[in-house]
Amino acid sequence: MLLKHALAEYLLEIEIRKYTPKTIRSYRNNLNLFVRYLTEEAEIDEVEELTLAAVRRFSLYMVERGKKGTYINGLLKTAKSFIQYCYEEGYGGFNTKKNFRWCKEEKPVITAFQTVHVRLMLASCNGYGFLPIRDKAILSVLFETGIRCW
């Protein structure tokens, strides 16, 4: 079966499963990129020709284009779902529940407050009324536990 026909059926399937419109749009965009890579770069037109090596080459292709690990893993998650659907429907592909590798994601670095800034924030809660004491208590909890409010 042609990849574009399998893709159309898969998109119909996720609409039937009542995925949100935003999710469907995201899957459509991600899978169009994946299928375009397969047909133009890897010269794979049939689902039967799809292999794990082709998916890994797609991952490398995205890394070489400077994409971040989080973005690549989002694409791979969508591609994995599509390939598993094709496999279960008997169109071809492979079982993605084995040997599917993810891209390494960068861990975010959270910068800590400097002591001067902490003192200034606590000093801004001056007074003995309800609000200054409450604000100082909230800041103390946030600083002591490392909780981040975004």
Question: Predicted segments — roles?
Answer:
Residues 1-150:
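Conserved catalytic core of the tyrosine transesterase superfamily
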